[in-house]
Amino acid sequence: MLTIYAPSDRPQSKCWEVFNGIQKTWPDTPVQIKDNDKSYYRENSDTMFWGLVNNNTNIIRDVEYFGFNYWFTDTPYFGRFDNNNLKADNHYWRICKNNIHASYIPSLDNARLNSFDITVKDKKDKGDYILICPSSAGIHRFIGQTGWLTDTITKIKKFTDRPIVVREKPRGRGTSGPSEAKIPLVEQLKNAWCCVTSCSISAVESLCEGVPVICHPKSFAQPICDTQLNAVNNPKYVEPTDWLRSLSYQQFTPEEFADGTAVSILKDLRLL
C-alpha cells in the first residue's frame, strides 16, 4: 500500500501534477489518498508527501520514528514551473526517498542533465561579502532550527569580518521562488565570496556560478560542500557537474510521472 497525504479538497493544487501520475503508475501496490491535515496512523506501508504543508512535518516525523519508507515531492532543482508559461514537459517536480531532498548518486550519465541549459562556471577566487540564503520557515522548523538565520549570522561574525548580505526567500502573488525576486540571485552572486544556506535550492545556482557554498548537514548540497561555518574564509569548491547529474535523475515532469518514466528511472536507480 502507498498512502499519499494530499489536500483532497484542493483539486487545483499542483500536487496533483505528481499524484495523478503516481496513482496510475506506482508498481505492485494499491494507492490510497488521505487528507494531510490528519494525524499519521501507524501502518506498514510507504507514504508520500507534497512539501511541508498542513500537518506533513509532524506526519513525516512519525513515519521516520516508526522506520517506514516515505517519498517526498516538491519543487525541482532546475526546470521550475512558470505560471505564465505552463506547457507539457516544460517543468519538473522532485521526488526523494526517506528525505526531503535528493540523495547523491554518483557517476550517472548526462542524458537528463542535457535537457537543461546549465552552464558551470569556473570557481571564483574573490568576493566582497557573504551571501546568506535562508530556507523557508517551514524547512527550519523541520530541521529543528527555527533560529537558524540569527544563529548563523552570530557564528559567521566569529570567523570573519567580511560584510554579510541576507537574501530572504522571494515571495509574492501567492507563490515563492525566482519569479518573485526583485533582484535575481545571479546578480547577488556576482560579488559574493560564498553562499551560506540551510537547505535552499540557491545552492544549485551558487555552485554553477562558481561560488562556494556552506550548507546545513541536512542539505542536498552536503555531499560536495562544507557544512561548518568555520570554513567561511576558505570554503571548499567541488566541480558540481556529477552532482547535477544526480539531481536531474530525481526530478520529473508531470507527463513523466504519468507515463511511467519516473517509476522506471527510480527502479533503475534502485530507489524503488
PLM region spans:
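Catalytic donor nucleotide-activated moiety binding site of glycosyltransferases and closely related
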Residues: 6-9, 133-134, 138, 147-185
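Donor nucleotide-activated moiety binding/catalytic core segment of transferases
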Residues: 33-41, 55, 165-213, 218-219
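Short, solvent-exposed loop/turn segments at secondary-structure junctions
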Residues: 9-11, 53-55, 76-79, 135-139, ...
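Structural motif
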Residues: 45-48, 129, 193-194
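Well-ordered, non-membrane alpha-helical segments in soluble/globular domains
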Residues: 15-23, 56-57, 145-159
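Extended catalytic core of nucleotide-activated donor transferases of GT-like folds
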Residues: 32-85
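Leloir-type glycosyltransferase catalytic cores
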Residues: 84-127, 223-272
